[in-house]
């Protein structure tokens, strides 16, 4: 592009915020023009994040001082409940918005208010938001003024299911079970006891067993693609003793004798961030660390009619900031891979 995209990041002091800063620094067509934080206003980005020394000369500003309305696009990497208050004004001024929180993901307002425990401040804008699962909604994302970036668990679980659901290959009335594990960074950067090394290290536990906020988000995607499946969906997340990474093991029943691996390969043939592994492979979280990739394998369980799908992503990249940059590329007519060519880190 002859003119760089001017980007702003609201709430840039969390893990998704610094991941956006890292990825956008390597993007040839983006200039990060504003980064905001009420608590760190006046602090240089490079002082707050030493990993970005020599990369950014910006300082954090309050949202009111940052000139966000002069940006082409603004990313909200904020806690739930912020974007729904601040995004409408920017959209009215012609700024395109990608919200990495959950404010615009769930279309049914009472459902959202039930799971997130607050009154929605911009219910009229929810219907205009495009759900930014890039590989599902490319055409709509390209035209969007507001993109609701998916959650990490919904991304990891939905990507292997989308091709099968679109062809109505899942068997109605049967359980669809997602057994998921996340690294501790998924809990965010704010201090809490459960994220302490002495609590999360050398330990493994389920959480949200009574119901996780990502459950209605995943069910919404399922219900929009095939009838009779969402009602049988069961989702249990676990906290794994690692920093980054997400692993989903999904158990499903197919309605016919088709080869699901072929269905996935055909659907994702032109999707550069999707890697369908050979049958019998077991994708590992370390194989996607730091990269905007989703690796998937699928095989039939021994002596059973149950199929087992394995899906891995980096929860901070494909599960958050990387998918947001991918959506930005689509919105501005760029190649999806632009600025996202990083190779996974190993070890």
From Swiss-Prot:
PROSITE patterns: ARGC. The keyword DNA damage does not apply. InterPro entries: AGPR_AS (IPR023013), AGPR_type-1 (IPR000706), NAD(P)-bd_dom_sf (IPR036291), NAGSA_dehydrogenase (IPR050085), Semialdehyde_DH_NAD-bd (IPR000534). SUPFAM superfamilies: Glyceraldehyde-3-phosphate dehydrogenase-like, C-terminal domain, NAD(P)-binding Rossmann-fold domains. Its EC number is 1.2.1.38. The active site is at 152. The keyword Cytoplasm applies. Pathway: Amino-acid biosynthesis; L-arginine biosynthesis; N(2)-acetyl-L-ornithine from L-glutamate: step 3/4. It is found in: Cytoplasm. GO terms for cellular component: cytoplasm. Catalyzes the NADPH-dependent reduction of N-acetyl-5-glutamyl phosphate to yield N-acetyl-L-glutamate 5-semialdehyde. This is N-acetyl-gamma-glutamyl-phosphate reductase. GO terms for molecular function: N-acetyl-gamma-glutamyl-phosphate reductase activity; NAD binding; NADP+ binding. Its main location: cytoplasm. One of its GO terms (biological process) is L-arginine biosynthetic process. Belongs to the NAGSA dehydrogenase family. Type 1 subfamily. It comes from Neisseria gonorrhoeae (strain NCCP11945). Keywords: Amino-acid biosynthesis, Arginine biosynthesis, Cytoplasm, NADP, Oxidoreductase. Pfam families: Semialdhyde_dh, Semialdhyde_dhC_1.
């Amino acid at each position: 592009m002859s003119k760089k995209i001017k980007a702003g990041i609201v709430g840039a002091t969390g893990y998704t915020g610094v991941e956006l800063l890292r990825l956008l620094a390597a993007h040839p067509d983006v200039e990060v023009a504003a980064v905001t934080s009420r608590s760190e206003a006046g602090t240089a980005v490079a002082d707050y994040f030493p990993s970005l020394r020599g990369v950014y000369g910006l300082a954090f500003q309050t949202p009111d001082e940052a000139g966000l309305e002069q940006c082409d696009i603004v990313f909200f990497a904020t806690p739930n409940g912020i974007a729904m208050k601040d995004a409408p004004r920017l959209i009215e001024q012609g700024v395109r918005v990608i919200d990495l929180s959950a404010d615009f993901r769930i279309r049914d307002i009472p459902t959202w208010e039930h799971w997130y425990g607050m009154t929605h401040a911009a219910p009229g804008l929810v219907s205009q938001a495009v759900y930014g699962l890039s590989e599902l909604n490319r055409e709509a994302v390209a035209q969007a003024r507001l993109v609701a970036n998916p959650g990490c668990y919904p991304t990891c679980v939905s990507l292997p299911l989308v091709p099968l659901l679109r062809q109505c290959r899942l068997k109605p009335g049967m359980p669809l079970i997602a057994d998921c594990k996340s690294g501790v960074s998924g809990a965010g950067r704010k201090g809490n006891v459960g994220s302490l090394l002495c609590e999360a290290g050398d330990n493994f536990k389920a959480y949200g067993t009574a119901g996780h906020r990502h459950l209605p988000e995943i069910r919404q995607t399922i219900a929009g693609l095939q009838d009779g499946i969402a009602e049988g969906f069961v989702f249990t997340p676990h906290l794994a003793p690692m920093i980054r990474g997400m692993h989903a093991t999904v158990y499903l029943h197919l309605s016919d004798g088709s080869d699901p691996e072929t269905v996935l390969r055909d659907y994702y043939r032109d999707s550069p961030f999707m890697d369908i592994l050979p049958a019998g492979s077991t994708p590992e979280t370390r194989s996607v660390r730091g990269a905007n990739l989703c690796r998937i394998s699928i095989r039939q369980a021994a002596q059973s009619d149950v199929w087992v799908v394995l899906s891995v992503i980096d929860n901070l990249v494909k599960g958050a900031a990387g998918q947001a940059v991918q959506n930005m590329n689509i919105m501005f007519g760029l190649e999806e891979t632009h600025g996202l060519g990083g190779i996974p880190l190993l070890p």
